From Swiss-Prot:
Residues 355-405 form the FBD domain. Keywords: Leucine-rich repeat, Repeat. LRR repeats lie at residues 88-114, 138-162, 165-190, 191-217, 250-275, 324-349. It comes from Arabidopsis thaliana. This is F-box/FBD/LRR-repeat protein At5g44980. SMART domains: FBD (SM00579), FBOX (SM00256). CDD domains: F-box_AtFBL13-like (cd22160). InterPro entries: F-box-like_dom_sf, F-box_AtFBL13-like, F-box_dom, FBD, FBL13/AtMIF1-like, LRR_dom_sf, LRR_FXL15/At3g58940/PEG3-like.
Length: 435
């Protein structure tokens, strides 16, 4: 008979193993044997989704489950509580009491995802004065009043998504940030509804400890402008997605290692001289970055930046991933001119059928001295061949050029190889065709 090694493990180790499972799967182990019957109750984490409870008695079963859990008196051992809550009308107030109780008993990780027609007011004072919370993630809750005290001395991770605020939305967010003295990771996804405000909103993100920051606003047609000011001297990783902001002002970002710019500055104001200056200042503020992902379409209507020399120098940038269109090669050329030490270049190429490709006119310094790896995704045989030949003919130290086709475009592979007629400037360069 095979030996049951798992049953020989101590309870402390088994509960850590069960912690890696979702709670609904952890509960299923209670039927294995008498020893396993209540073992799941000792797991220091609880992950719940109210829709997983059986319909039509979902609400009653959920309430009984939570009552049993609390009666077992394991609340003091719980370190992580995650709940995805879909309306259980009879339990909403009790849920808030439960969360408050768990926080008072030393909870470290709290994730609350509310899916209700009426948002839940999530302003319990003890939550924002917790001495043990390390991570806090809130989705679709209400924080309308900025008149509350925040003191979270251990909080390192904060995520706010789709939060409902009153007119003091930015102040609420700023208060949360300022009350986290060791905050390292901040993610703001639609942190307040920009459609409901009639005046310019200014969000200040100021932190001496922040290392990673993600900002994502939804795109709305009818909305007010907003501005973001970021002051974070230890920031290493930054992502700005689809914000269409009026301006993004950055200060003290000398530690910045990587940035992902998916944002489009206010598209109605690209011809505004002030906006051009704001955008130039933004690029200057991130010029120490080493790794960048950018959509060159973000620069498309800032026509002065299509000329070499008018983009700030990125002396430290060695890895660039850019999404570009066939008509924006002049922007790529200008951007490469500002990256004299670039080593790795990844291009996601998009074809504009009604636009002609603009030829390169210069050879940037990085092609002459530093560029070693180029990858072009989704190349099109007619519009991309000039670009490919340009890199092969002008990159003196290029080691590898990879053309990555999708499954649907792999039929062009053979004909594409025939079109590559240029002489490689770098004799050791490999041309790789892949999917």
């Amino acid at each position: 008979m095979d030996r049951d090694y798992i049953s020989e493990l101590p309870d402390s180790l088994l509960t850590q193993i069960l912690l890696e499972l979702r709670t609904k799967d952890s509960v299923k182990t209670s039927v294995l044997s008498k020893r396993w019957r209540n073992l799941w109750l000792n797991v220091p984490g609880l992950e719940l989704f109210t829709l997983q409870f059986t319909y039509p008695d979902r609400e009653e079963i959920f309430v009984r489950f939570m009552d049993r859990f609390m009666e077992f008196k394991c609340r003091s051992r719980l370190k992580k509580f995650m709940i995805t809550y879909v309306d259980c009308k009879g339990y909403r107030d009790r849920l808030m009491e439960l969360i408050g109780t768990l926080v008072d008993h030393g909870l470290q990780h709290l994730y609350v995802f509310m899916h209700t027609f009426d948002r839940v007011d999530f302003k319990r004072q003890n939550i924002y004065k917790s001495k043990t919370l390390v991570s806090l993630k809130l989705h679709n809750v209400e924080l309308k009043n900025s008149d509350f005290v925040v003191s979270l001395p251990c909080l390192k991770i904060l995520k706010l998504e789709n939060i409902c605020h009153g007119e003091d939305g930015p102040l609420v967010v700023e208060k949360l940030i300022s009350g986290c003295s060791v905050l390292e990771d901040l993610e703001l996804i639609r942190p307040f509804d920009i459609r409901t405000h009639k005046v310019l909103l200014l969000l200040r993100v100021s932190s001496q400890t922040l290392k990673s920051f993600t900002l994502h606003f939804a795109i709305y047609k009818d909305r007010t402008d907003f501005s973001v000011e970021i002051d974070a001297p230890r920031l290493k990783y930054m992502t700005v997605e689809q914000s269409q902001s009026d301006s993004i002002v950055v200060k003290n970002l000398s530690s910045l290692f990587s940035i992902d710019i998916g944002t489009k500055f206010n598209p109605l104001r690209h011809e505004d001289l002030r906006m051009r200056n704001v955008f130039y200042d933004f690029l200057t503020g991130i010029s120490s970055v080493k790794h960048m992902i950018i959509c060159l379409w973000s620069l498309q209507r800032f026509s002065p930046y299509s000329k070499p020399g008018l983009i700030p120098k990125f002396q430290n940038l060695y890895h660039l991933k850019a999404q570009m269109w066939s008509s924006s090669t002049h922007l790529l050329e200008a951007f490469l001119e500002s990256c004299p030490n670039l080593k790795n270049l990844i291009l996601e190429y998009n074809v504009e059928l009604d636009r002609e490709q603009v030829d390169f006119t210069n050879v940037p310094q990085c092609l002459i001295s530093t560029l070693e790896y180029v990858e072009i995704k989704e190349p099109n045989e007619k519009s991309t061949i000039k670009l490919v030949n340009y890199f092969l003919e002008n990159s003196a130290v290029l080691k590898k050029l990879t053309l990555r086709f999708s499954y649907s475009s792999s039929i062009y592979l053979k004909s594409y190889k025939k079109l590559l007629t240029s002489t490689k400037l770098s004799p050791t360069c490999q041309v790789i065709f892949g999917c």
